[in-house]
Amino acid sequence: RLLEAIRTLNMEKEVRFYQASTSEMFGQSPPPQSEETLFQPRSPYAAAKLYSYWITRNYREAYNLFACNGILFNHESPLRGETFVTRKITMAIADIYHGKKKKFWIGNLDAKRDWGHAKDYVEGMWKIINYRKPEDFVLATGKSFSVRDFCEIAFKEIGINLKWKGRGLREKGYNRKNNKVLIEVDKRYFRPTEVDFLQGNASKAKRLLKWKPKIEFHDLVSEMVKNDIDNFKNQ
């Protein structure tokens, strides 16, 4: 509707339109995924986002609108919604740190994502919308980590080293020091159609927009854990 409004009001030269696309559109396409990678959406969310991607391109090509897609890989911050896996982990660790809970449950430990910081990606979005012409860009760090990696790094922020025992649904994460169970796997948190491995290639954005992420994955995880620990204190 926004694109059609721009067209019917003859505002093509006055309005720049940015569509927030997602790396989930790539689905099972092998990494690294770039602007040229085949889309294979594996969820209703990804399919809907793919429609938005193509309608944006269509209006750009058909009506000469300044309409562009930013295909953003996972970007996190302490403001991430509480239903997302990264925030579930950091909030659970804050609860464990403060003695509110002893363990938590999680889904696929081996799903790999290209996680960056929202601050870097907002800067990238600004660069996309201010580029000299409308184009589509992938924004990504080029590095991929598993949910398991995220858990291990996050627990180290409270002085706990994890070790893993078991396989599949029976796998558990233990405190290496006292052998207490901290993480269990629950099939309820698995996706019906999982996306196993996302890792972006943002070379186009680096070349044309002079954009590159500044905040490393470990620093991102550390910031999120510390923020949730502090939030717990303030409750």
PLM region spans:
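C-terminal substrate-binding subdomain of Rossmann-fold SDR/epimerase-dehydratase oxidoreductases
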Residues: 82-235
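N-terminal Rossmann-like NAD(P)+-binding domain of SDR-like oxidoreductases, especially those catalyzing
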Residues: 1-77, 119, 125, 129, ...
